[in-house]
Amino acid sequence: MRKLVYLVLVLGLTFLNVRCKSETKQNKKEEQNIGKQYSSLENRFQKLVNYPVGANNFPRSMSLAPEVVHKVPSKDWTSGFFPGNLWLIHELTGDSIYKVKAQEWTVLMEDQKENDRTHDMGFKVYCSFGEGLKQDPDNQYYKDVIIESAKTLITRYNDTVKSIRSWDFNKDVWDFPVIIDNMMNLELLFEATKISGDNIYHNIAVQHANTTLKHQFRPDYSVFHVINYDTISGVVKTKDTHQGFDRNSTWARGQAWAIYGYTMSYRYTNNPKYLAQAEATTQFYMEHENLPKDGVPYWDFNDPEISDAPRDASAAAIVTSALFELYTYTNNKTYLDFATQVLNTLNSEAYLLKDTVNGPFILNHSTGNWPKNDEIDEPIVYGDYYFLEALKRKQNLILK
């Protein structure tokens, strides 16, 4: 496909004016740069493909001193990202060995399709089976698992609250918690309707997105992490955080989930309110006085010791991937330039793991759960997923 696009570009030079020639040269230069980027990442990619397959062996994060890979079973909310990483690397490189390994890991996620104790079905199933379906669109097995998973996920929907319940723990604290992360799981529902033709999944996803839009944001478009609803009346009981610094702070990854979630929701609905929300939350993020110059945020924008706070490369990767898509809907070059800058920053020695590190990860310097002192300044699997997706989206823009 890349060769075909390149050939079309070359043949078209005969008919292009000077400006178009300049733009074509720039595209070719960027395409060459992408090739160099993949070459520089090849050693890290090999660490992923050589990692041993196992049902309880999904790599979630990694300590570096000493080197210890933190492994989880398929029930963990992060388990679907590693199969997704392999699918994305296959798409980026065309090397079939990554597809073979992606298939082996993906089938290990099937046991989650009836797990009704989690809201993270999209992360688990769509990042694995969904990525597989993109590359094998006639695979009925993948379609069936996605549909069954969507059926399971909507059992957590409450029609009074008009949202999908997030966690089941802390029932003495929360009646019906909904976290901003949950926006990411709507993609599974939107796709389930496309596959099955049944609008129930799409409609529930829209209801959830509407409720979140109404209650989860402050006037400046920063996001609350957790909204607690009353299941009898549907009204908001409390607005809180679980992974941010405090209830009034802006947790960087939460803001990233919001940017990505409403950009993705616009893709499936063409609802201008979702596009406006994606742009407003992006503006808050990009213009925040505490965002470092390299575009990789501190774990929370309001950490009182901000200059010494750990960064969160995963949040940067999520936003970068989202902005490449948001650019296609708005033609706002500010988004493209910012995303390109941050992608280049992530794809540098400052954030890439050294070749000598043996774990199946790519990026360093992500922060998982600061309040619990868990996964601080470490490689984390979902950071890699959105980094790889951002690389792919950038490639698609260049080859378009």
Curated annotation (Swiss-Prot):
InterPro entries: 6-hairpin_glycosidase_sf, 6hp_glycosidase-like_sf, UG_Glycosaminoglycan_Hydrolase. Its EC number is 3.2.1.-. One of its GO terms (cellular component) is cell surface. Keywords: Hydrolase, Signal. GO terms for biological process: polysaccharide catabolic process. It comes from Formosa agariphila (strain DSM 15362 / KCTC 12365 / LMG 23005 / KMM 3901 / M-2Alg 35-1). GO terms for molecular function: chondroitin hydrolase activity. The active site is at D120 (nucleophile), D181 (proton donor). It is an enzyme of class 3 (hydrolase). Residues 1-20 form the signal peptide. Unsaturated glucuronyl hydrolase involved in ulvan degradation. Ulvan is the main polysaccharide component of the Ulvales (green seaweed) cell wall. It is composed of disaccharide building blocks comprising 3-sulfated rhamnose (Rha3S) linked to D-glucuronic acid (GlcA), L-iduronic acid (IduA), or D-xylose (Xyl). Unsaturated glucuronyl hydrolase catalyzes the cleavage of the unsaturated 4-deoxy-L-threo-hex-4-enopyranosiduronic acid (deltaUA) at the non-reducing end of ulvan oligomers, thus forming 5-dehydro-4-deoxy-D-glucuronate. Belongs to the glycosyl hydrolase 88 family. It is found in: Cell surface. This is Unsaturated glucuronyl hydrolase.
